[in-house]
Regions:
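Feature for exported/extracytoplasmic and membrane-associated proteins, marking the mature portion
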Residues: 1-259, 278, 300-357
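Generic beta-strand/beta-sheet core signal
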Residues: 221-224, 268-270, 295
Length: 357
């Protein structure tokens, strides 16, 4: 509610007496909705018709646990604990013989569960500027030490019980990927400035890898901070975070456009859940129905789904917003419409696509 703001709904001020954004600071996108002022860098893409907003995104019986909800988004398994990441399946479908060790790349530390699948190599880049150091690992003992490091990085994503076999299957490929990725900075020339934050760095690295034409089809990153969990001090903290993310994404888009590499990129960004309708005096607690964004030169911008009702009798238990778009519907559009894959097989069912492509 403080990201895409229902500024003309009287319940917004009722529910957010401490945290409501002043109306004269809101950036209108319709006569009912507006962006938080810190999202100003993204407004141009809305005006271009290249930014889609999916309102009320979530899933039935939404979990209020960060870890469980992230797992559900990662594995498309709301009813049971899944081990296979949906993007891990995408990487395998795109490259079933495993011929390209860089079909999928994570920008950040460790291996997010979304990318985890047995036998599927994924390189994780903490800092592309120093990633080439791995190319110097030559001796067998040093390579073994590196594989042990990969094991400790990847265990949280796939479980310690299967990590040894996973590393045996994927660790060597990941090291090969490191050798190749280390060449990307030398192919990149750009004057676009990025924020000097972790997110800015990850997206700059992402632009370099995309520019290098390694055949990478899945580029993934996660905001490297947990302070989007704004139970307190939300007014300042949320604004700073939105500014960082919006500016980083704007820099990335400007970069790949000036590089002539934007026609085959679609960005999908989301949070694993929304926030409670009512503020707690300083912040907001875990909620359900949230918002997701899709950005790219091939995106049909606009609003998709309905903004969750703020009527008191339409809120879920605890004062949470109802979801009205299943996140797997957005995945369906990305998989069928963008990647040309069988979404049903990957996400485990048929879901009505969201027509943003």
């Amino acid at each position: 509610m403080n990201t895409v703001i229902p500024y003309n709904n009287p319940h917004y001020r009722d529910y957010r007496p401490a945290l409501g954004v002043p109306e004269d600071q809101i950036i209108p996108i319709t006569d009912q909705l507006g962006f938080h002022p810190a999202m100003a860098p993204l407004k141009k893409y809305w005006d271009e018709g290249k930014l889609a907003i999916i309102q009320g995104i979530g899933y039935p019986n939404g979990s209020l646990s960060h870890f469980r909800s992230m797992d559900i988004w990662a594995t498309c398994e709301p009813e049971e604990l899944g081990l296979t990441g949906w993007l891990g399946s995408v990487i395998q479908d795109v490259d079933p013989k495993g011929e390209n060790v860089l079909t999928g790349v994570n920008f950040g530390r460790g291996l997010p569960r979304s990318l985890a699948k047995e036998g599927v190599p994924v390189a994780s880049v903490g800092d592309l500027g120093t990633y080439g150091l791995l190319t110097e690992i030559g001796a067998e003992a040093q390579r073994a030490e590196a594989l042990d490091l990969f094991g400790r990085m990847y265990a949280p994503a796939i479980g310690q019980g299967v990590v040894d076999d996973y590393i045996r299957r994927t660790g060597i490929e990941a090291l090969k990927g490191a050798d190749i990725l280390g060449t990307a900075p030398g192919m990149y020339k750009s004057e676009v400035e990025y924020p000097s934050s972790a997110m800015g760095g990850y997206l700059r690295d992402m632009a370099q890898v995309h520019n290098a034409d390694f055949g990478t089809r899945v580029l993934f990153t996660t905001a490297p901070y947990n302070i989007f969990d704004t139970h307190a001090n939300q007014a300042v903290g949320h604004a700073n975070l939105l500014q960082d993310v919006s500016s980083s994404i704007d820099s990335f888009m400007a970069d790949i456009r000036q590089l002539g590499k934007s026609d085959n990129v679609t960005l999908f960004f989301y949070s694993e859940f929304g926030r409670r309708a009512m503020d707690n005096g300083s912040g907001t607690d875990h909620g359900t129905g949230g918002v997701a964004f899709v950005l790219g030169d091939n995106v049909k911008g606009g609003l998709y789904g309905e903004y969750p009702s703020l009527e008191p009798n339409k809120l879920e238990d605890g004062g949470n917003l109802q979801h009205n778009v299943d996140f797997r519907s957005a995945y369906t559009t990305l998989l069928d419409g963008w990647m040309g894959l069988d979404a049903k097989a990957i996400i485990g069912g048929a879901f009505e696509p969201v027509p943003f492509l």
